[in-house]
């Protein structure tokens, strides 16, 4: 059996960089990790509550957290940041929500929103799109093909999508996948973006995995 390594961890230091940039003493490290998770959960919950119901996609590609002694800087990379862009009240509300989670008085919090030019070239946004389709009982093949069409508009070199679970409500769980273009997982210099996403449907949980090949360094 082939041993499948996480494509992001495999490429750290070459084509991938860390999403959390900070140092901590070994005894404080676990606290820092929990802090990061709280920040990310808080942002995702806020976006979920405030986004327009029609779009169905949160549009968060990734969240980068940089910490200094006196400052926590959070950069949110979004595909569709309409309700936060040009809305200082929204960002202030989000900031106060995050600060409620922490009791550190001496650290200032700074939130920045960065818009992504081609949102459907990001696996997280694509996985949310597929999840929305599956929840609306669209057939999985149709959802996969539509997702591939969207990535082709984003100038990607290749994509692989895998869905596992009780697909279309069948009794027996199975794995279905589709690949378009090249996805060289063993080439370290290949820029590959990956995400795994769980979607809860009325039949049970489905796992979606997406690999996107953006080119070689």
Curated annotation (Swiss-Prot):
- UniProt GO MF annotations: rRNA binding; structural constituent of ribosome
One record GO biological process: translation
The record's annotation in PANTHER family points to:
30S/40S RIBOSOMAL PROTEIN S3, SMALL RIBOSOMAL SUBUNIT PROTEIN US3C
Please name the InterPro entries in this protein's record.
KH_dom-like_a/b, KH_sf_prok-type, Ribosomal_S3_C_sf, Ribosomal_uS3_bac-typ, Ribosomal_uS3_C, Ribosomal_uS3_CS
Q: Which family does it belong to?
A: Belongs to the universal ribosomal protein uS3 family.
Protein name, per record: Small ribosomal subunit protein uS3c
Location(s) in or outside the cell: Plastid, Chloroplast
Q: Which CDD domains match?
A: KH-II_30S_S3
The protein's assembly and partners:
Part of the 30S ribosomal subunit.
User: Which Gene Ontology cellular component terms are annotated?
Assistant: chloroplast; cytosolic small ribosomal subunit
Which residues belong to any copy of the KH type-2 domain?
A: 43-117
Which Pfam families has this protein been placed in? Ribosomal_S3_C
Q: Which UniProt keywords apply?
A: Chloroplast, Plastid, Ribonucleoprotein, Ribosomal protein, RNA-binding, rRNA-binding
